[in-house]
Amino acid sequence: MKTENINHAFLDGVLDGTHDDVYYHFGVASSDPVLDKLRDVRAVIMAGSGGRINEFTERWSELNAGTEIVAFPKEDRFVTRYTAGVLFASHGMGMPSASIALQELMRMVFFLKRGDLEAMDEVFWCRVGTSGGVGLPGGTVVVSSEGLMADLKPYRLLNGGTGEYWFDGHFPAATSQAIIAANEHTDFDIISGTTIAGNEFFLEQFRLDGAICLETPETKMGWLTWLHDNGVANIEMEGAMIAGYLNH
C-alpha cells in the first residue's frame, strides 16, 4: 500500500537495498546496525534542547527498569536517545532547524517500520517545550489543538517564484483530549488551545528587546490582544511546521 504524500521514489529504494538512507544530521544511516535496536519504536518525542532530551531519556529508562539507552554518535546538531520504545530527539530552535530533524526522523521511521503504513500510523509523535502563554497563568501546560503562524494562517513554504506550499496545521483532537484526560489529577493546569509558531524569535513575536525592533508597546499589545481574541493559548517556534509535515 502506498500514499502519494510519501516520497516512494526515494524511500522504496532504501527498503529494497538499492541505496542507503543517510540521516546526516543524526550521524547514522539505514545500514547501521544500531538502528536494529529501534525497530519497536512506538513514540518519537522531540524537544528543542539536548539537555532536555537527556533528562527525558534517563527518566523514561528509570521508569522502565533501567532499560538500555541507545545514543547516536553525532551530536553537533541534534541529540538523540532511544530507550524502552521511545525515540527522543532534539531539534534546535525554530522551524527551519526543526524541519531538518523532522524530515530525517520521518524517513527513519519509514525505514524502521519497513514502509508499513499501519505500523507508521501507530507511532505517536510529540514535541515538548517551553512557550509563552497568552493570557494564561505561568506554568500552564498547553496541549496544542492547532499550529498556526504569526498571521493566524497555516504553515507554508515558498515554491520558488510560482507560489506557496500550504500545510494543514491541525493536531488530532482525540489525541489532545486523551493527553488532557490522562493528566486531570495532576497538580498543574493543563488546557487545549491554538499555538502560534513564530518564524523569527524577535520580530515575528513582536519583541521589543532585539537589535532590530520594528514594533512599539502599543503594536505588541495589539497583536497579543488579537491572538487572545482568536483563541490562541501560547506562542513558540515549531508547532505549525510539525503539525503540517506530519499531517502531510
Where are these regions (language model features)?
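A short glycine-rich, hydrophobically flanked beta-strand micro-motif that places a catalytic Asp/Glu
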Residues: 126, 194, 235
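Conserved protein kinase catalytic core
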Residues: 133-135, 203, 244
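Metabolite-binding pocket within alpha/beta catalytic cores that recognizes anionic/polar moieties
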Residues: 1-180
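Histidine- and/or cysteine-centered catalytic micro-motif in compact active-site loops
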Residues: 131, 146-147, 195-200, 240
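Active-site rim beta-loop-alpha module in soluble metabolic enzymes
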Residues: 168-231
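A C-terminal functional module that forms or caps the active site or interfaces directly
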Residues: 221-248
